[in-house]
Structures are given as structure tokens and as C-alpha cells.
């Protein structure tokens, strides 16, 4: 529903693996900040099971992770990401490995990869 517009705001490739489920614009709770409004975008992982997981059953979603992304139209942007959990035929729980397909955050940060690299260049 929101994906056409969201494709302009989200990191490249995100919509291949996640769907936008909601968004919200909320006032920033902090004072003395650059942005007085926050744009929250909620993403749920799509069914991206590889063939070796075809016998698994969806077990809902794991805990939500939040990442900061580029500000959009003078609004701090926060991505809320929920990854799927799968129950395998042997009863174990597993998630689809996305690390080689898409990097949601820059290692050691809570920033999207592109935003972290931008900040690193801006800071010298």
C-alpha cells in the first residue's frame, strides 16, 4: 500500500525483503534538538524462505529492532524492523539469513548502512 512512496525514503533493497506495515509522524520528546518531528516507518519481513526451509511454519515475529536513517523532510527517520521466526519440522526455531543479501545497519551502530557512511564522511 505504501511501498511506491516508501521506495524513495528507504535504503535500497529493503522493500525486496520487507513490507511497510505502517508509518507514523510523532513529535520529538526531547528538547533542544534539530528535528521536532519523527517519522516512524514500520517494516515486517516478507516470506523469503529458501528452499531448504520449505517445511517450516511461521512462528510470528521476533522483537522489533530500531535503526536511524536519513532525515526526511526535516523529520528524524526511525525504521522499526520485525524479523520473522520459523519453526522447523524438528521443532527448532530459525530466521532467514539476510546478512549476505541486505545490510540493514552498519556494524557497531544503530544507523542504516548508508546513513552511517554519510555521517562518517561528514565528520572526516
Per-region residue spans from a language model:
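Feature targets compositionally biased, intrinsically disordered low-complexity regions
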Residues: 3, 12, 54, 59-61, ...
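Compositionally biased, low-structure terminal segments
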Residues: 19, 24, 62, 68-71, ...
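Generic alpha-helix signal with a bias toward terminal, lower-confidence helices
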Residues: 21, 30, 53-55, 79, ...
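N-terminal juxtadomain amphipathic helix
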Residues: 37-87
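N-terminal alpha-helical interaction blocks
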Residues: 1-48
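Polar low-complexity intrinsically disordered regions enriched in Ser/Thr and small residues
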Residues: 7, 16, 58, 63-65, ...
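Short, positively charged, Gly/Tyr-enriched micro-motifs
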Residues: 67-124
Amino acid at each position: 500500500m505504501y511501498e511506491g512512496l516508501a521506495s524513495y525514503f528507504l535504503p535500497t533493497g529493503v522493500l525486496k525483503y520487507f513490507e511497510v506495515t505502517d508509518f507514523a509522524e510523532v513529535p520529538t520528546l526531547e528538547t533542544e534538538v534539530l528535528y521536532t518531528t519523527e517519522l516512524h516507518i514500520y517494516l515486517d519481513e516478507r516470506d523469503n524462505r529458501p528452499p531448504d526451509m520449505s517445511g517450516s511454519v511461521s512462528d510470528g515475529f521476533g522483537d522489533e529492532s530500531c535503526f536511524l536513517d536519513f532525515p526526511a523532510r526535516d523529520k528524524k527517520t526511525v525504521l522499526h524492523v520485525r524479523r520473522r521466526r520459523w519453526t522447523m519440522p524438528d521443532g527448532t526455531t530459525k530466521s532467514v539469513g539476510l546478512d549476505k543479501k541486505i545490510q540493514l545497519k552498519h556494524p557497531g551502530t544503530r544507523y542504516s548502512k548508508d546513513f552511517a557512511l554519510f555521517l562518517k564522511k561528514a565528520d572526516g
